Amino acid sequence: MQVSRRKFFKICAGGMAGTSAAMLGFAPANVLAAPREYKLLRAFESRNTCTYCAVSCGMLLYSTGKPYNSLSSHTGTNTRSKLFHIEGDPDHPVSRGALCPKGAGSLDYVNSESRSLYPQYRAPGSDKWERISWKDAIKRIARLMKDDRDANFVEKDSNGKTVNRWATTGIMTASAMSNEAALLTQKWIRMLGMVPVCNQANTUHGPTVASLAPSFGRGAMTNNWVDIKNANLIIVQGGNPAEAHPVGFRWAIEAKKNGAKIIVIDPRFNRTASVADLHAPIRSGSDITFLMGVIRYLLETNQIQHEYVKHYTNASFLIDEGFKFEDGLFVGYNEEKRNYDKSKWNYQFDENGHAKRDMTLQHPRCVINILKEHVSRYTPEMVERITGVKQKLFLQICEEIGKTSVPNKTMTHLYALGFTEHSIGTQNIRSMAIIQLLLGNMGMPGGGINALRGHSNVQGTTDMGLLPMSLPGYMRLPNDKDTSYDQYINAITPKDIVPNQVNYYRHTSKFFVSMMKTFYGDNATKENGWGFDFLPKADRLYDPITHVKLMNEGKLHGWILQGFNVLNSLPNKNKTLSGMSKLKYLVVMDPLQTESSEFWRNFGESNNVNPAEIQTEVFRLPTTCFAEEEGSIVNSGRWTQWHWKGCDQPGEALPDVDILSMLREEMHELYKKEGGQGIESFEAMTWNYAQPHSPSAVELAKELNGYALEDLYDPNGNLMYKKGQLLNGFAHLRDDGTTTSGNWLYVGQWTEKGNQTANRDNSDPSGLGCTIGWGFAWPANRRVLYSRASLDINGNPWDKNRQLIKWNGKNWNWFDIADYGTQPPGSDTGPFIMSAEGVGRLFAVDKIANGPMPEHYEPVESPIDTNPFHPNVVTDPTLRIYKEDREFIGSNKEYPFVATTYRLTEHFHSWTAQSALNIIAQPQQFVEIGEKLAAEKGIQKGDMVKITSRRGYIKAVAVVTKRLKDLEIDGRVVHHIGLPIHWNMKALNGKGNRGFSTNTLTPSWGEAITQTPEYKTFLVNIEKVGEA
């Protein structure tokens, strides 16, 4: 290598490195030929959490200089730090340095060509964007919002009751934003009185809360990712974690190395099935039949954990004599209203109001006996007839499940959207909840029901109540039937029905008042019911399907999309597109230039619209992404983990909290100048931050935790907290106005000792994956929920090798923080402390709107013409299907094939379509069909095919595969078609291919309780339209 001295210094730009090397006597050629400096040596390193799924893998971020934030100095006044490298964090106890293809490609997302860099405006009827300033954008949006609010705000309803609601502008909130941004968003929407509010959680895991909370007391994953390694048997039904959560699935593989078996029950032979011991191909939409068949098997063969069932479930409780189930209907059905009177779905009570029990389990009205009768119809023959799973294979799986009924073996269940996105999603999960209670697997390491969350903070944003009928901490938003604070609290606080139980929700008033003091400060007083009238009172359920309906009817005028790409996410894309075209204004807050922000643009066949006909004003506001902000997010296992800002945001992008705060500030000025509607409730909301236009994550995290507003003393007169100190635990909350907490579940996450969510002690003295020094897990840093159930009533472990808690004379804390009080061994206080009964519910009484026990109902679009169990009641009789959507129900004669949607490991919805590495890995839209169906339709691998449902069509490349088998269902052959969900009408410049939104095909009806859309089971046809 020959380089002159002059050229050498020119290359080095006269830099110190070159001159110093030369002065030391090195020849220019030798210096240039020397190994280059390690690229990370001078980088700024920060720790973060992956922004995709809720495995929440740890990341190390490296940037060119220290990013600016309010707590530290910037690298320089004229420079910005830029992210240039991401790798896995080897210290993280779940991911241990690993990243999946999505996480590995996240650098391309942060630095994507499709990042939104400055505010843009699309005028009504226009076909182009105009760049505008932040000042102009905020002023115009605030004006539109105030005008709509003033014209449509309802302070009092027709009965004269204060409701303070605004129902003509809605918001779809982000599930990847931090807890801190979520809390501020919650305050912002309640300040405005906005009631059309929802979150991505509703379109995915809505049924999780609706099923797990009535079953056990809380609606969250019961164990955690690492704990999966402790299982003897892993049932994967309703998910494909090897594909969708590959780094988390490593712990299932670890269990397999330890001798565990994996069984997959899924329509496809998927990635998880490829490492399983057994795979049962099942018809999509028939899971309840399979699982109720398992329950029948366990009860008939007596393979249940008897002591656990007797003491820790409601098996012994006597059910009302009026309860019955006949011909597909539970007692109390109202055909006109399509709902149930649930008064007979309850216990028998004695003269003291306590539930009656028969501990011998002999009484015919015992829950266990009613359950036996209910499942008696689910024979192996009926299981095969409805699900397509052969009897021999079904019984083999039942046998493996039954083996875990002994105290020293556990089974865990892993599920995700394959369970939830059905019209019977809640009851899918309930079926497995019953099984796990019968087997004694709840509360056990290696047991539980593990809901695998799909978005990085969908758990946290759900906890923060960003749902139609929610407040933080799973308290219900008041509705127009709630007349006062006292009436409301009485309605939502469960009564004691079994003596000596914890029934921790008895403290709901403390959670609510502390939240209201966080929201309204000195404006919330005992005299005004702690500001109860300030809160909006909902008049209906505003789920996403309803948002779209109201837009199409001209009743929803404005829509704010906060990191939610609705055009690609909501069902029946054409209906969503039609509704968006009728909006007066649309505000899109997103790091990326999403399809939703350009719904008005003609992209040809996949989005064939005329911009001139669309009069919606559209604002595209650039926001920061995960790498450009600090805060906390919550993984599937309820671990709250802090992440630090890794680089500066590009262009003029701003954090969500800044944008919301600026809009509030501008609207506040307009109200001061002009007056208007709902001013009192608007101004009552506190916004006491150091910089009101830009609240910091630290301020918000502390506000979320909560403070003492006065000196607090214990019952013995000892000082617990001085005024202004942060609280240590939710047991110290009070309902007298002396404490605050934005969310009672998170008290203890930031104390006077500091930020507990930033803890990074990954030691595991238990050997069971219980790293309580890492982050903070709600509630109270407990890592396994219902853990008292892992011991018998005398405190002896069911399995001494799986023991995380034990009695120490004062409490049950040991390797884990016990999910229990301080009652000693032998106490009759049950382990399910959030349940009024103190036990897990095999029979859900009146807690679930469509039945106290699961029952098989056909999908709305079914490949068979009947329900073999009860032909007069084919589908769930409580389903809500809007009149206009009934016209779009497809028949199996026109659309004979069952379609189901799913993810690929290389992509995350349509998000990664803006990430070059992920596009290169999976560039082209395809569909999967089985070999027999392909032969019938004359389709070969690589052919272009058209898939059509009653809602529309898409085109994609055919992948002919052995992974999909035809099934015999009720005497006919049923084929499945697999539809990956990741493509859309846009494509990153020069990379990948444009495609169609899979949601062009999906139906606009949802699960009966949460309205989560039925993405997983609907009918389509397929035809060849082009050669390979």
Curated annotation (Swiss-Prot):
Keywords: 4Fe-4S, Iron, Iron-sulfur, Metal-binding, Molybdenum, NAD, Oxidoreductase, Periplasm, Selenocysteine, Signal. Residues 1-33 form the signal peptide. The keyword Transcription does not apply. Its cofactor is Mo-bis(molybdopterin guanine dinucleotide); [4Fe-4S] cluster. The keyword Nucleotide-binding does not apply. GO terms for molecular function: 4 iron, 4 sulfur cluster binding; electron transfer activity; formate dehydrogenase (cytochrome-c-553) activity; formate dehydrogenase (NAD+) activity; formate dehydrogenase (quinone) activity; metal ion binding; molybdopterin cofactor binding. SMART domains: Molybdop_Fe4S4. [4Fe-4S] cluster binds at residues 50, 53, 57, 100. Its EC number is 1.17.1.9. Residues 43-114 form the 4Fe-4S Mo/W bis-MGD-type domain. SUPFAM superfamilies: ADC-like, Formate dehydrogenase/DMSO reductase, domains 1-3. GO terms for cellular component: formate dehydrogenase complex; periplasmic space. Predicted to be exported by the Tat system. The position of the signal peptide cleavage has not been experimentally proven. Binds 1 molybdenum-bis(molybdopterin guanine dinucleotide) (Mo-bis-MGD) cofactor per subunit. Binds 1 [4Fe-4S] cluster. It is found in: Periplasm. It catalyses: formate + NAD(+) = CO2 + NADH. GO terms for biological process: anaerobic respiration; formate oxidation. Formate dehydrogenase is a membrane-bound complex, formed by subunits alpha, beta and gamma. Belongs to the prokaryotic molybdopterin-containing oxidoreductase family. Allows to use formate as major electron donor during anaerobic respiration. Subunit alpha possibly forms the active site. This is Formate dehydrogenase major subunit. It comes from Haemophilus influenzae (strain ATCC 51907 / DSM 11121 / KW20 / Rd).
